[in-house]
Amino acid sequence: MKHRVGRVEGEILRELTKILRKDIRDPRLSEVTITAVECTNDLSYATIYYSLLTEDAEKEKEVQEGLDKAKGMMRHLLGQTLTVYKVPELIFKRDNSVKYGSKIDRLIAEVKKQDAERASK
């Protein structure tokens, strides 16, 4: 069963990315990138993780509202392409791992800069 869930998760990720780029015309969602999908074992719910390039709290709220508004349309379009009996209910959550990764990169760059300054003294 786990293999099937993983296959469906990959299919949902691929199809939602296409739907977001081609079919959803909401300007609030132009900077959204879907990073991962996790389905329950019975495939009744799919948690969709997304990332943004901005750290603006107001923009994050607008994007979440846009995703919630487009959820029904996305689920309908998914139903036309997925090979499952019932299309999972979509739940959108912000993926902070990209933001966390860029913070780590900045900290590493800062440490390297400090090391270079110490070495030159």
Swiss-Prot record:
Gene: rbfA
Record GO biological process: maturation of SSU-rRNA
Subunit structure and binding partners: Monomer. Binds 30S ribosomal subunits, but not 50S ribosomal subunits or 70S ribosomes.
GO cellular component: cytosol
Main localization (coarse): cytoplasm
Stated family: Belongs to the RbfA family.
Pfam families given in the database record: RBFA
Name this protein carries in UniProt: Ribosome-binding factor A
Organism: Lactobacillus acidophilus (strain ATCC 700396 / NCK56 / N2 / NCFM)
InterPro entries assigned to the protein according to its UniProt record, in alphabetical order: KH_dom-like_a/b, RbfA, RbfA_dom_sf, Ribosome-bd_factorA_CS
Assigned keywords, A-Z: Cytoplasm, Ribosome biogenesis
UniProt keyword annotation of Hydrolase present: no
Molecular function as annotated in GO: ribosomal small subunit binding
